Amino acid sequence: MEDRNTSRIKMLCQFIKRTIRTIDITDEYIEWLCFANAGMLHKGNLYCFDLAIKHLPSNKPILEVGSFCGLSTNILNYYLKRTGRNNKMITCDKWIFEGSEKGRYLGNSDVLHSEYKAFVKETFVRNISVFSRSNLPYHMEVTSDEFFKLWSDKKVVADIFGREIELGGEISFCYIDGNHTYDFARRDFENTDRYLEKGGLILFDDSYDGSPFGCARLMKELVRNRDYELVIKNPNYLFRKKK
């Protein structure tokens, strides 16, 4: 019991430290958006989004790996519009959730995993159609590995709205919020690095110090990477490519 309590106290202390150090720029629009748009977003990411978009090196596309119901997608678009940027936004998510392989139903409910996936996808489409209509993102229903293969091959593909787009070329920013295991996060970084232009930025979700996810291990490696510089931890890591 004592070990369990000690562990809980340590986790609480880590949470308090992250909260105290976090720069939060939530405004009225973000508050209303978060009421209606489901999502799991650390408020510290808002400042990182805003900072990255204000310092985009060009008008080349920005990418989002992992979109869920579109909360971060809509927030990124909000900051793009607010800063007068017109970068094309391209996102990918196949909506394959942890635990879906364990059974047909969500826990002890009568809701099927397939129904849940369809609901989340429909919610994403509805959310970005309303809140990002002035710069509607191109979304690919593929995994990040599949997406970067399409990008590498410079494929012309149709997004979930049926619009054609030619993939490929350099990008100016990537928000990595896909599978948080070390291997997946590492691969997402390596794929992003191939196309990120000099001065481009990468933000890793749930990468804060003490995070239980494997992507936190990757951060320890990236801070030693001479090709990148740490812009800020708030508490998640935002990097800029130096060369």
PLM features per residue range, with description:
Residues 27-36, 46, 50-243:
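S-adenosylmethionine/decaboxylated-SAM
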